[in-house]
């Protein structure tokens, strides 16, 4: 299978690049700079893309790459930091300037296949302070920005662009990728996530030679698809375990068990609510909550494994963003720990299987549809592994848990009524320690402040707050304050990711 190698220089944009390439129908694989030359040398790799990154090419310890990457006679496209790395490595000059941030107009100077379908001037997205002052010998400048910076350059099959074609703010970014992949790299293969089902099933079957596979299910699309793929591969050797930690959305445990049973997968239900909730009581720190939930989950899982002596494998629904947000990709900053990533406790002694590790959420949904799963599962909003605990800011209490659960149900119900639920990435409520004076039943009342968070995204790597009509927000607010006596104020979160994260904790 023909593929593109995306070299990750530490920025989370590397995954956005990979997604955009896959959207064009070409498989993209991410590699660290240290392994780039070896991986790029493989015959199936038809092109290399050097990602952006948070560093300066002149900083001590900044990500670097072997110049051999340019001697492979394969098309190379450097983006932002990758563009500057090309200049530095091949004899150009990189300087620090005022930079460009946000929407910028670039002017195309030369007709080039990379810009087929572009107008003479197009809007792009810039995010840089360093810039290429002089291109390397033999390079031609293809485009400049409205501020006079080199926006694109080329020598033979080596291209560099200062802007970010992978973000939607670059209006013709997808067209550029199509040009680079199909016209310059001449890649003809067409890759689709739903076409990978047979391969995934065969890979699982080849790995699970003997023994059973245990998989934790939650009702979400990731764990459900994982369980179904396992079932297709090894049948009744799949042992699905639903651990009820008491932190799920309303009705979720029952729905999850019912669905899997209808497919033919037996589900072992473990009621561990008290075990989790007692340990969380009063805990305020976000990472401490995640640690407690992760460790308790592992303990409960371990107890389950002990009751299944033939279990030799543990399957998880880990996705690409899970990996990058946990800092598992070299050069990426750790944002928050993820309960699915970071290794297994030593007492598990199980081999880990992650059938979805190479996919993004939208690709998993496409696989789910191809597997024939119900639309309620396919389009279920992402839900954090630690559950509603990370939507409680400050000390954890059962009172706050009940508030968040009820408020989230109201948010989801109103969005469904308005036909907006599937149009947003996530929608939920959070609660903290702050309180607000209110009036209920003609009497003064002191109640909690609930914050509603609704975001739009494609992959959770970046997200924008959703411009929900005011009348919908008004209904949500009215219902929350009317139906949850402990709440006197509802606010709406209007910060995007970055600088914020989607979840509050």
Swiss-Prot record:
It is an enzyme of class 6 (ligase). Its EC number is 6.3.5.2. One of its GO terms (cellular component) is cytosol. InterPro entries: Class_I_gatase-like, GATASE, GMP_synth_C, GMP_synth_GATase, GMP_synthase, GMPS_ATP_PPase_dom, NAD/GMP_synthase, Rossmann-like_a/b/a_fold. GO terms for molecular function: ATP binding; GMP synthase activity. GO terms for biological process: GMP biosynthetic process. It catalyses: XMP + L-glutamine + ATP + H2O = GMP + L-glutamate + AMP + diphosphate + 2 H(+). Signal peptide: none annotated. Residues 191-380 form the GMPS ATP-PPase domain. Pathway: Purine metabolism; GMP biosynthesis; GMP from XMP (L-Gln route): step 1/1. PROSITE patterns: GATASE_TYPE_1, GMPS_ATP_PPASE. The active site is at residues 80, 164, 166. It comes from the Archaea. Residues 3-190 form the Glutamine amidotransferase type-1 domain. Pfam families: GATase, GMP_synt_C, NAD_synthase. ATP binds at residues 218-224. Keywords: ATP-binding, Glutamine amidotransferase, GMP biosynthesis, Ligase, Nucleotide-binding, Purine biosynthesis. CDD domains: GATase1_GMP_Synthase (cd01742), GMP_synthase_C (cd01997). Catalyzes the synthesis of GMP from XMP. HAMAP family: GMP_synthase. This is GMP synthase [glutamine-hydrolyzing]. It comes from Pyrobaculum aerophilum (strain ATCC 51768 / DSM 7523 / JCM 9630 / CIP 104966 / NBRC 100827 / IM2).
């Amino acid at each position: 299978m023909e593929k593109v190698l995306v070299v990750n220089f530490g920025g989370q944009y590397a995954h956005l690049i990979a997604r955009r390439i896959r959207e064009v129908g070409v498989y993209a694989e991410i590699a660290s700079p240290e392994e780039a030359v070896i991986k790029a040398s493989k015959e199936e790799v038809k092109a290399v893309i050097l990602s952006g990154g948070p560093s300066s090419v002149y900083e001590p310890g900044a990500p670097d790459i072997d110049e051999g990457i340019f001697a492979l006679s394969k098309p190379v496209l450097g983006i932002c930091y990758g563009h500057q790395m090309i200049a530095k490595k091949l004899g150009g000059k990189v300087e620090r300037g005022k930079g460009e941030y946000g929407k910028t107009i670039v002017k195309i100077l030369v007709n080039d296949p990379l810009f087929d379908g572009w107008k003479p001037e197009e809007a792009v997205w810039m995010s840089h302070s360093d810039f290429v002052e002089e291109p390397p010998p033999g390079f031609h400048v293809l485009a400049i920005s409205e501020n006079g910076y080199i926006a694109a350059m080329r020598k033979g099959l080596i291209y560099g662009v200062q802007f970010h074609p992978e973000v939607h703010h670059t209006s013709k970014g997808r067209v550029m990728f199509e040009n680079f992949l199909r016209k310059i790299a001449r890649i003809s293969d067409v890759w689709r996530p739903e076409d990978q089902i047979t391969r995934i099933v065969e890979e699982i079957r080849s790995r699970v030679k003997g023994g059973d596979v245990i998989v934790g299910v939650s009702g979400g699309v990731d764990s459900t698809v994982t369980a179904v793929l396992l079932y297709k591969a090894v049948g009744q050797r799949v042992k699905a375990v639903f651990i009820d930690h008491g932190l799920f959305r309303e009705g979720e445990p029952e729905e999850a068990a019912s669905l899997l049973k209808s497919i033919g997968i037996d589900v072992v239900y473990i009621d561990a609510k008290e075990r989790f909730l007692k340990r969380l009581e009063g805990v305020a720190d976000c990472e401490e909550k995640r640690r407690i939930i992760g460790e308790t989950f592992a303990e409960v899982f371990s107890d389950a494994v002990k009751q299944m002596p033939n279990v030799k494998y543990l399957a998880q629904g880990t996705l690409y963003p899970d990996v990058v947000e946990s800092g598992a990709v070299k050069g990426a900053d750790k944002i928050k720990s993820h309960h699915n990533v970071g290794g297994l406790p030593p007492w598990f002694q199980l081999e880990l299987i992650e059938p979805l590790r190479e996919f993004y959420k939208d690709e998993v949904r496409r696989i789910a549809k191809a597997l024939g799963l119900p639309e309620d599962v396919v389009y279920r909003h992402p839900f954090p592994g630690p559950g509603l605990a990370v939507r409680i800011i400050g000390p954890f209490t059962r009172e706050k848990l009940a508030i968040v659960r009820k408020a989230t149900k109201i948010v989801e119900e109103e969005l469904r009524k308005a036909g907006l639920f599937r149009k947003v990435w996530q929608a939920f409520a959070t609660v903290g320690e702050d309180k607000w004076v209110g009036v209920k039943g003609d009497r003064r009342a002191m109640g909690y402040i609930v914050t509603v968070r609704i975001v739009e995204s494609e992959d959770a790597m970046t997200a924008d707050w959703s411009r929900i009509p005011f009348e919908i927000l008004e209904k949500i607010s009215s219902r929350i304050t009317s139906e949850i006596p402990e709440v006197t104020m509802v606010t709406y979160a209007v910060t995007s990711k970055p600088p914020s994260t989607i979840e509050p904790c």
